[in-house]
From Swiss-Prot:
Lineage: Bacteria, Pseudomonadati, Pseudomonadota, Alphaproteobacteria, Hyphomicrobiales
Short name of one Pfam family: DUF179
InterPro entries: AlgH-like
SUPFAM superfamilies assigned to the protein according to its UniProt record, in alphabetical order: VC0467-like
Protein name, as recorded: UPF0301 protein Bind_0718
The species this protein was found in: Beijerinckia indica subsp. indica (strain ATCC 9039 / DSM 1715 / NCIMB 8712)
Gene3D superfamilies assigned: VC0467-like (3.40.1740.10)
Family indicated by similarity: Belongs to the UPF0301 (AlgH) family.
Any one of the GO CC terms: cytosol
Amino acid sequence: MISMMSLDSTQSTGAFLDGQLLIAMPNMVDNRFARSVIYLCAHSEEGAMGIVLNRAARKINFPQLLVQLEVIGADEAIRLPNSAETMQVLNGGPVETGRGFVLHSDDFFIDNSTLPIDGGVSLTATIDILRAIAKGSGPHQAILALGYAGWSAGQLEEEIQHNGWLNCPADPSLIFDDALGSKYERALRKVGIDPGYLSSEAGHA
């Protein structure tokens, strides 16, 4: 059963990378993250958590998910607003794949549930946001991810140091773009890198 979850509202400070994009480098040895673009939702001394932005979830779409979670009845799926019918459902990462996370624009907020991140992007992981989207009263922009990418204390820093990831400021237009197949190349180009010339020796943007 897929479920939503509560969020820890503690945000990191200082030289952490919350609100930035992680772009996998060509030497990424973990096939789960090869050519992935990840939005980093939280980063602190205790570890990091992010959502993969360019991999679609298999075997389920948003209307089906709403029915499964009993947000709507099966007969109501045909009456959803267009924004709900077409909303992306992503494979957000390999951790807790039965949990749902909604990345969205900051025009929507639920007390004690929504975590503002950076640059007009927030994260909500309770079923209330799904109800709002189903009614057409949700955020202007949103994507739903099942699962997330997680790192233990110091793990992400070590991977970046060993050129596993490129990090750069996030762009909401890229986060919420539904052209998943070209998102990796476009993320690289946004930091001035031609994907055809990128090598495993490249540094940070």
